[in-house]
């Protein structure tokens, strides 16, 4: 199953991706979560078998969250250089696996994580592009899952589809975009192209609904994704509420527009 906060449970293994349960900023009064979206705290999380971090930006790697999960996390997989943060924050280096683009890590039990490119950047405060950013494919005994991370549209989506045909799930960025950022964040038209390139059975648009990092209306990404789903039902786009579980082994239909005000 997959929950909206990018928590997956597959074959009794719990996988958590880029968890941020606090502010997405080094300053507590910037990028605070929308009211009603902070449904979970790190203390609510069960033991995590695999923690995947796609890059080191504040809205994907949060000190307060990961340190509270430290004693309940079995393995961390991240791009090159990001493991330094985890070591500094007290994680056991033996439980940290850094990967470069094109590398992979076998985790046992039929689980393998593949590190692949993304078109983005990295940096925290004044440390720009000293660590790598990436997308990942998590291969399990029953599923192939693509984790797009952040980034603009490029040929890497088609490359991943050729290397990993018949993807079961794609988790794609959909939100916090701008024409000025089109090379580092996908625009709505780019999401459509990425969905077509990957050809995954199910697509979960994320990176929306919790923080305002761009100037577009907060619900615009959801409306665009819903329109894409209506235009192309075969795309398998799913837009669950935050925290709502979705069975990955079923083809559930698109839920109602939960983000709109109920009609009287």
Enumerate the predicted regions with their spans.
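Single conserved hydrophobic/aromatic residue that forms the stacking wall/gate
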Residues: 1-6, 10
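Pre-active-site segment of Zn-dependent metallo-hydrolases
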Residues: 13-56, 63-68, 78-81, 123, ...
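Active-site-proximal beta-strand elements of phosphoester/diester hydrolases
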Residues: 14-18, 112-118, 144-150
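Divalent metal-coordination and catalytic microenvironments
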Residues: 18, 55, 62, 76, ...
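Active-site metal-binding loops of divalent metal-dependent hydrolases
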Residues: 19-21, 56, 118-119, 149-151, ...
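Cap/insert and terminal regions of metallo-dependent hydrolase folds
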Residues: 38, 45, 50, 75-84, ...
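Metal-dependent catalytic neighborhoods of phosphoester/phosphodiester hydrolases
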Residues: 62-71, 213-223, 249-250
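Metallo-beta-lactamase
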Residues: 79-143, 224-243, 248-254
């Amino acid at each position: 199953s997959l929950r909206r906060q990018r928590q997956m449970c597959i074959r009794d293994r719990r996988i958590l991706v880029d968890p941020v349960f606090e502010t997405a900023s080094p300053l507590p009064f910037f990028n605070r979560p929308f009211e009603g979206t902070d449904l979970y705290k790190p203390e609510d999380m069960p033991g995590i078998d695999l923690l995947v971090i796609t890059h080191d930006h504040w809205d994907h790697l949060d000190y307060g969250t990961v340190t509270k999960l430290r004693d309940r996390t079995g393995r961390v997989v991240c791009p090159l250089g990001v493991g330094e943060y985890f070591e500094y924050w007290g994680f056991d280096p033996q439980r940290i696996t850094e990967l470069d683009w094109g590398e992979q890590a076998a985790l046992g039990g039929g689980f393998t994580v593949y590190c692949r490119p993304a078109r983005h950047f990295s940096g925290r405060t004044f440390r720009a592009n000293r660590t790598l950013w990436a997308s990942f494919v998590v291969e399990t005994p029953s599923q192939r899952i693509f984790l797009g991370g952040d980034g603009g549209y490029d040929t890497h989506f088609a490359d991943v589809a050729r290397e990993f045909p018949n993807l079961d799930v794609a988790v794609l960025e959909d939100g916090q975009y701008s024409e000025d950022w089109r090379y580092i964040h996908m625009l709505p038209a780019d999401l459509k192209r990425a969905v077509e390139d990957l050809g995954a059975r199910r697509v979960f648009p994320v990176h929306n609904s919790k923080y305002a990092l761009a100037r577009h209306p907060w619900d615009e990404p959801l409306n665009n994704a819903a329109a894409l789903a209506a235009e192309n039902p075969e795309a398998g786009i799913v837009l669950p509420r935050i925290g709502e579980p979705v069975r990955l082994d079923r083809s559930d239909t698109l839920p109602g527009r939960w983000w709109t005000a109920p009609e009287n």
